Regions:
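C-terminal helicase lobe and adjacent C-terminal extensions/tails of nucleic-acid helicase motors
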Residues: 304, 329, 456, 491-497, ...
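P-loop NTPase motor module signature
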Residues: 1-526, 533
Length: 594
């Protein structure tokens, strides 16, 4: 009798032992269709190297936990209803069909059509937002928070349940969140650690017509990413300002542009009245000379004229917070009965910002920056007063300084503003400039990429290893001199070397640190150096103060008192040290109160 087992018999036993393992592995691979997209690659890598029953059991437990997270998110999504009065609701099925059949869809509609609040709900209805988030970008923090609150309210939930938001210094996203509102800057920062955007199954780029630097970079990045993420859907929403440009940008390999769907619905006629800020004055010699009049007086006179037209709220556009405060004071001096004056700009507190959306009696006059032009829909507006001005960021290649001058807006922006009065009924818009002046204005506002310093976007591109900058698919390529200026600044900051790799410079260790900090490269360089010198806490306060508007209030009627109150924080040698004194005072006061 032979005690030795034959090789054939041994091999057969090994194969039999491996059969259950192969079966379990196959089942686990199939189960990956139900786990978050961001986890799939990690699970595949673990499964590839797992050969024992114990290893597969551990992976199986983790896969089941991941599937439970997806199921939890799905179970939390309520039944979805759509306001039938919104134009976008009438095109619901058309939009859902296009999203199902195409990787990119462009949706064009005027402010108030409902596209910003209803499209995320349609995507939830389609089953998206389960294995990955529906990322929804906004150009402004106020809009991101307000839109998230509105969608959550329509779903009957609190913020942070199925709908959350992430803006600088405030993150309200939980493990049940399916729709994530955020500024486009937040999404750009996330690319540093999630280059394939695996946290998302859908990206909505809202207000794309604004053509900010971040939006243009995101559109180029997504064009490169889509072939590598065939499961990712991209929705580009825009006002009816050249939506075909976005469709052409996302043309497929055969050159077919992405589909465009119009959802503006009905708009009402708007009567445009021109009231230039000049007053004819008869001179001693009998001639008539036009004298410039005060803008605030012009706004007050326009409001008086519109109040004689009938009921309805008035929306007035200004270029700055200071002008808004001055106008509030001027209107309050009129002592109009039953008139509420409400400001609207980005630096207001949450409670003050919500006032503009709260129900009210009587007439309301809303004094706003251009945030109400497209980002937010102010309800009840029948009349508009347009000063024709806005702060527009511009970079001087000669002085190497980024400025924020007050300029005349474009024809497209003026039409956007006047259109706010024709959403629910016939409207009237008063422009505080002449028709000749309007006709002489540029048709569109220059995209930000043509009027800003490009150091930050160039740094992002180098960090993400996107190759030759001149080959990047920008919707509109930047000026070569602006790119050179950006590279020169990064070189001066010590962020890049003289060497090149793949047609692009190479980051230094300092450059890699700067790229991870979501502020202007010059300020990020300050933080890196402060950390090296051991003064990071103080310099962080100074940098933070440089990235926002002055926190000190100087109301027109209390300027002397304000200056007296602020005097204790003044440092004769440096405004930066004044900011630090103010911060220390706030910290000490908080400690005392607590």
């Amino acid at each position: 009798m032979n005690d030795h087992t034959s090789p054939t018999s041994s091999s057969s036993k090994t194969d039999n032992a491996q059969q259950p393992t192969k079966s379990v592995k196959s089942q686990l691979y199939q189960a990956l269709d139900d786990v978050p997209i961001a986890d799939v690659r990690r699970f595949r890598r673990r499964l590839k190297n797992a050969n024992s029953a114990d290893a597969l059991a551990a992976i199986g437990a983790d896969v089941e936990a991941a599937r439970s997270g997806v199921a939890k998110r799905d179970a939390h999504i309520p039944a979805i209803e759509y306001p039938e009065h919104l134009p976008v609701s009438a095109r619901r099925q058309d939009i859902m069909d296009l999203v199902r059949d195409h990787q990119v869809v462009v949706i064009a509609g005027e402010t108030g059509s409902g596209k910003t609040t209803q499209i995320p709900k349609m995507l939830l209805d389609m089953g998206r937002g389960r294995r990955g988030l529906i990322g929804h970008t906004q150009p402004r923090r106020l809009a991101a928070r307000t839109v998230a609150e509105r969608i959550a309210d329509e779903l009957g939930q609190e913020i942070g349940e199925s709908v959350g938001y992430a803006i600088r210094f405030d993150d309200r996203v939980s493990d049940t969140t399916a729709v994530k509102l955020m500024t486009d800057g937040i999404l750009l920062a996330e690319m540093q650690r999630d280059r394939f955007l695996n946290a998302y199954d859908t990206i909505i780029i809202d207000e794309a017509h604004e053509r900010s630097l971040n939006i243009d970079f995101l559109l180029g990045y997504l064009k490169r990413l889509l072939p590598k993420r065939p499961d990712l859907k991209v929705i580009v929403t825009s006002a009816t300002i050249d939506p075909d440009a976005f469709a052409r940008h996302f043309a497929d390999a055969e050159g077919n542009p992405a589909p465009v769907i119009e959802v503006s619905g009905r708009t009402y006629p708007v009567e445009i009245r021109y009231r230039p800020l000049v007053e004819p004055v008869e001179m001693k010699d009998g001639s008539v000379k036009e004298i410039d009049t005060d803008m605030i007086d012009g706004v007050v006179d326009a409001c008086k004229e519109l109040m004689r037209e009938g009921d309805g709220d008035i929306l007035c556009f200004f270029s700055s917070e200071r002008d808004i405060r001055d106008c509030m004071e001027a209107i309050e001096k009129q002592h109009w009965r039953g008139v509420e004056v409400v400001p609207l700009f980005g630096r207001l507190s949450n409670a003050e910002q919500h006032r503009v959306f709260a129900p009210h009696s009587g007439r309301r006059i809303v004094l706003s920056t251009n945030i109400a032009e497209t980002s937010l829909t102010v309800p009840g507006i029948h009349y508009v007063v347009d000063t024709g001005l806005a702060r527009i960021s511009r970079y001087s290649t000669r002085t190497k300084v980024q400025r924020l001058p007050i300029e005349e807006i474009s024809q497209a922006s003026a039409n956007q503003r006047s259109g706010r009065s024709g959403r629910t009924a016939d409207g009237v818009a008063i422009r505080l400039y002449s028709e000749e002046n309007f006709s002489a204005r540029p048709e569109f506002t220059d995209p930000e990429i043509l009027r800003t310093n490009l150091a930050s976007v160039v740094l992002q591109m180098i960090s993400l290893r996107l190759g030759d900058i001149s080959e990047f698919p920008f919707i509109q390529p930047p000026d070569r001199k602006a790119v050179r200026d950006g590279l020169m600044l990064l070189h001066e900051l010590g962020a890049i070397t003289d060497k090149e790799r793949g047609g692009a410079p190479v980051l230094t260790a300092v450059g890699r640190d700067i790229a991870r900090i979501p502020v202007d490269p010059k300020m990020a360089r300050m933080l890196v150096e402060a950390n090296r010198l051991g003064v990071l806490d103080d310099v962080t306060v100074i940098v933070a103060s440089m990235t926002i508007q002055d926190v000190r209030e100087r109301p027109l009627e209390y300027q002397a008192q304000a200056d007296q109150a602020h005097a204790r924080f003044k440092d004769a040698t440096s405004d930066f040290l004044s900011s630090l004194k103010l911060w220390d005072y706030i910290g000490d006061s908080r400690d005392e109160l607590s």
